Structure formats: structure tokens, C-alpha cells
Amino acid sequence: MVYLRSGEGAMRPHVSELVINWHITEACNYKCRYCYAKWDGAGRELLHDWTRVRNLLDELQAFFHPENDANPLSQHMTWSSIRLNLAGGEPLLYHDALLRALEYARSKGMGASIITNGSRLTNDLIDRLAPLVSMLGLSLDSADPSRNIGIGRIDSRGSLLDVDSLSEVLVRAKTQNSALRLKVNTVVNALNHQEDMTPIMHALMPDRWKVLRMLQVVTSDLAVSSEDFLAFVARHDALREVMCVEDNDDMSESYIMVDPLGRFFQNTAGQKGYHYSSPIDVIGAERAFIEWRFSAGTYAARYRDALVVGRE
């Protein structure tokens, strides 16, 4: 069900891009303690079945096409184009399948972007990836190794993200795609809320820095108070030109999200877990969409005039 929340007017807002977030896998080489990428349901992840991937993308492209007046979302907002954002888990664990999906999405007229923890970005991969995406999203919660270890941002071999090497890869990405934009996602939690991330933001120079309060949809581990979250935001006021702040209420029922099994899914404020539709490639996007709750006004407020990829 698509709806406007109380206080949202009748005028249809417009966004340049409608962003569809497909979480292609739950698998990840990190074990972040507050990770929300945990979904119910059994079965093989859709990414590993090319026929189903193609059918899913065909359904999404047709249903969310800006000229599809049958989409109930068009009654509440308008948009000029579609962008497919691939997330995880860690989507680059399956980089060949990811690249194939990106290429197909672009062949259907969709824009493309990804969100990654950065650990699998190599020169060879960035040479293939950068020309396919308009934005590269990077999940980065701390510049401090001990905090990253505490959060769980460390792989099974004990390796942490090398920020210096990452910076070099990002420079290379720009040489492959001069129009590429960088977005950084930071989840404010009990371990990093006192950190000053200004130096690393100056080093990376993102076009957008999304600052999100840890969302208690799967676990309450490392939850942070409203006061501590707002203090983190205030500490980084000098970066307000690129900072986009989202508290928990802003993240409820306001993203277009598809899980690894090809279902629309959504979180609701004050509730644990997710609500799911049936698989989109099985019953079609139109039928699946009506099984699902979505706040068009909150979505439009986030994306209007903003260079963002979505939650990831």
C-alpha cells in the first residue's frame, strides 16, 4: 500500500531518480554486530539464477517506468528515471554476477549504483565497475581500527579496511568515470558516536555523507541514544553541505527495497523484523507492490535534490 503520512500535502513531489535498492546477498565478509541485512525465508538467492535475475529486472523496469501510470506510486509522486542500487551483505563477493546485473539494468535504460564495504575493491575490479555506475557508495563507520574491530568490521583473516589503499582505488575510479560520485554511509552506534570523522571525510571528499542512527530492526546491539546521535551530527556541522542525516523514523517505510529472494521488504517503526511481499519475478511487480507498505512523501523528501544511493 502506498500512502502519504499525516501532514504530507496533496501536491505530488518530483524526484529526478527513483532509486530501487536490491540487496543481492546476505553473505558478507564482515560481521557488523548491528547488521540489518538479515532476512527471513529459505531458498537460493536469486542472484545465482540468471533467468530469474533478468525477469526481476524486467519487472522492476516496466513497473517503475516513469510513464507507467498504473503504478500506484505515480498518484503520490513523479520521477524522471530509475536507478538500480545493488547492496548486500557485501555485493562484491559475487562481482561477476553483480557486473552482469548492472550491465543488463543499463541495457534496459536504468541507471546503476552500488554500496560496498570497500574491502573487495581492487584496481582490476574498479576498472570494470566504475564505467557502469553513476555513484559508488561506501559503508564506513570509523577510521579507528579498534572501533572497527569492536563493531565487527573485520574479516575472518583479521583484515581491516585499508583506508589509504581505498583512497588510491577511488582516485583510479575517477579516471575510469569522471562523472562518478562518491557517497559514504556511516551508522552511528554505541562505539563510534564520540568519534570525529572530519579528517577521513576530508580525505575521501564524498559528494554525499549519509549519517544514519543505528536501526534496531534486527538487533538492539550497539544501539545509541537520541542525544548521542544528535551530538555526533552537531560535531560534524562543518560538513553539513554534504551530510544527509536520518534518524530511525526517517528510515521506516520509506525505501524501495528488494531482498536476496526477490521480494519487496520493508521495516516499520517500533517493530522488529521485516514485512515481505511475494517474489516479484513470480507474481509480477504490480501484484507484489500492493502487498507492501510505502510512504511516498517521506521517500520524496529524502531524494529530492539529493545525490544519494539509498540505505545500504
Where are these regions (language model features)?
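Conserved alpha-helical substructure of the radical SAM core
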Residues: 3-88, 92-113, 123-127
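Hydrophobic faces of well-ordered beta-strands that scaffold small-molecule active sites
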Residues: 20, 84-86, 112-114, 136-138, ...
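Flexible, active-site-proximal loop/turn residues at the rims of small-molecule/cofactor binding pockets
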Residues: 41, 90, 120, 142, ...
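Radical SAM enzyme [4Fe-4S]-AdoMet core and its adjacent flexible, acidic
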Residues: 44, 48, 145-265, 269, ...
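Alpha-helical scaffolding segments of alpha/beta enzyme cores, especially the outer helices
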Residues: 55, 59, 96-107, 124, ...
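Short, well-ordered coil/turn segments that N-cap beta-strands
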Residues: 80-82, 108-110, 132-134, 178-180, ...
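Short beta->alpha connector loops
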Residues: 91-92, 116-121, 188-192
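Structural recognition of alpha->loop->beta junctions
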Residues: 125-143, 200-211
